[in-house]
Amino acid sequence: MRHAFVFVISTVLASSAARAQAPRKTPGGERARVEREIQKLEEHRFQAMIGVDLKTLDRLLADDLSYTHSSGKVDTKATFLAALRSGELKYESIRTEDIKTRVYGNSAVVTGRGEIKVKSGNQELSFPIRFTDVYVKRDGRWVMVAWQSTRIAQQ
């Protein structure tokens, strides 16, 4: 009898410890809601980039943003917004597809493909990209902390 009691207690403690160490998962319905919320933020961000809506971008981008362009140039939030404000960088259109959003508690990773038309300095460019960006929830709201895009080779 004593061995059975020790076995039951050991099993309960082991399963409790395993549950405590398991990563927190967002319930299915909540995860889907957050994924939709992040996708809407992405749409607003792209529209704000095209429309040079600096107020919206200031709200959507984290102060510690790392924005890596497909050229390899890295901007901070301040330098990215300054380039848009000055007209040095002007997005003409941004079309996206194959968007996937994955939520991990207070973080979300977005991946996808895009077609970018942009004026950078005196150059007008149009090219396809693959991108990854990361959102985190801070002070009750989602902000983008990282963007990285890679040009897709034209075939």
Task: List each language-model region with its residue ranges.
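A beta-strand edge to alpha-helix "cap/lid" segment located at domain peripheries
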Residues: R19-L60, D64-Q155
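Bacterial N-terminal signal peptides
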Residues: V6-S15
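Positively charged n-region of N-terminal signal peptides that target proteins for export
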Residues: M1-A4
